[in-house]
Curated annotation (Swiss-Prot):
The lineage of its organism: Bacteria, Pseudomonadati, Pseudomonadota, Alphaproteobacteria, Hyphomicrobiales. The gene is ybeY. Binds 1 zinc ion. Keywords: Cytoplasm, Endonuclease, Hydrolase, Metal-binding, Nuclease, Ribosome biogenesis, rRNA processing, Zinc. It is an enzyme of class 3 (hydrolase). It holds the Pfam family YbeY. It comes from Methylocella silvestris (strain DSM 15510 / CIP 108128 / LMG 27833 / NCIMB 13906 / BL2). SUPFAM superfamilies: Metalloproteases ('zincins'), catalytic domain. This is Endoribonuclease YbeY. One of its GO terms (cellular component) is cytoplasm. It comes from the Bacteria.
């Protein structure tokens, strides 16, 4: 099952990023396969590629955290087997680029990791408890390994702990 993926580019920096739609589809299809998720027949998600200012506003509004982060997920909250709209993933260019550089990882690989991580939140995974975090990270490693991407947790990224929790509430600002 392949969901419909709506892509919105809300920051000029992403204009040079080669084919985000294909990367998103590849990562999400592999994540569905590895997780065994059963989605609604007409499942749909949106991915917003934005800048730090855009995501900082969302982070402040929905999480009460007054700074940018790498990715936010906005799950719709319904059962994934019957809910057509799974939710939204928002990825910030500057933070993602900085983290990739600091970790010595290719930018595209880090974006792939954030797409997988964000999508797992949309289908019900979280990392609030240690056991849940371990299971989620193991699944991310497996997905990325299948795509030929190195283990994203070899070196911890500063924003992974403070920015990847699912967010409750609608993301109306990008669905205009």
């Amino acid at each position: 099952m392949k969901p419909v993926i709506d892509i919105a580019v809300e920051a000029e920096a992403w204009e040079s990023f080669e084919d985000p739609a294909t990367l998103a589809e590849t990562v999400i299809v592999q994540t569905i396969s590895q997780s065994g998720a059963k989605l609604a027949a007409e499942a749909e998600i949106s991915i917003v590629f934005c800048d730090d200012a855009f995501i900082a506003d969302l982070n402040r509004k929905w999480r009460g955290v007054d700074k940018p982060t790498n990715v936010l997920s906005f799950p719709s909250g319904g059962p994934i087997a019957v809910t057509p709209v799974l939710g939204d993933i928002v990825i910030a260019y500057e933070t993602t680029e900085r983290e990739a550089q600091e970790a010595g990882k290719p930018f595209r690989d880090h974006v792939a990791h954030l797409i997988a991580h964000g999508f797992l939140h949309l289908i019900g995974y979280d990392h609030l408890a240690a056991a849940d975090a371990e299971a989620m990270e193991a699944l991310e490693r497996s997905v990325l390994a299948r795509l030929g991407i190195d283990d994203p947790y070899q070196e911890p990224l500063a924003s992974v702990e403070d920015g990847l929790a699912p967010v409750k509430g609608p993301l109306t600002s990008v669905k205009e």
